[in-house]
Each structure stands twice: as C-alpha cells, then as structure tokens.
Amino acid sequence: MGCVLVMSLVFHLSHEEYVTLLPKSITTAIGMGVSEELGGIVTITVAVIIITGVFGNIIGEFVCKIFHITDSVAKGIALGSAAHAIGTAKALELGEVEGAMSGLSIAVSGVLTVILSILFAQFL
C-alpha cells in the first residue's frame, strides 16, 4: 500500500484512482469490496488484481532465486502475499509447505489490507 501511495503522489492520481489501486495485492473477492467501499472503480481494481497475480506468478520463483531465498515457508509467504491465489497455485507447484504458507498468507494479507486500506485511504 505504501508503494501505491508513493506512485499516486508521483503521478498525481485522483483519490478515486488511488483507492482503486489500494487493494491490488489481495484476492479479487476481497479487493472488489474494499474498492467499492472506498469509492474506487471496481472493474479497474479487478484488472489490477489479476495483473498483479499473473506478474507475481511469472517472476516469483525467479525473485526467490536472485535473493537466495531457499526456505519453504518464506517462499510460500512471499508468493501468497504478493501474488495471492495465482501465486498460491505456483507455490503448490514448488511444494506442500510453500502452498500451505501461501494460503495462510492470503488470509492474513486480506485481513490486514482491509484494516489498513481504511487508514491509507485518508492520505490522498
């Protein structure tokens, strides 16, 4: 969310555009509700969430290799929190522990994003 705030300030996004992008790293079902509640454009939020998931799925394993992340728990949490359900599919390909941790991180990220997005929505 901090990245979205900085990008919004740099590119002078409106409040509506800003809150549209806030829920980019949670599942579509939760993200749609957050975007709608904060006054964002739900259809764009859905597209951004899907793009985030696909991009995270494509580069997630590569990023773990670059930064020498070998721990199964860390890989799962990274993929789940960054690329949500699509990342969890990738994590399950890597292993059972990665998949379990990815699923758990989706839930935790969802709850934290719902709470923090209310606070972050006030910044712009």
Predicted regions and their residues:
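Short helix-capping/hinge motifs at transmembrane helix termini and TM-loop junctions
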Residues: 11-12, 39, 68, 124
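Alpha-helical membrane segments and immediately flanking helix-loop junctions
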Residues: 15-44, 50-51, 55, 70-108
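Transmembrane alpha-helical segments of multi-pass membrane transport proteins and ion-pumping complexes
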Residues: 1-9, 28-32, 53-65, 85, ...
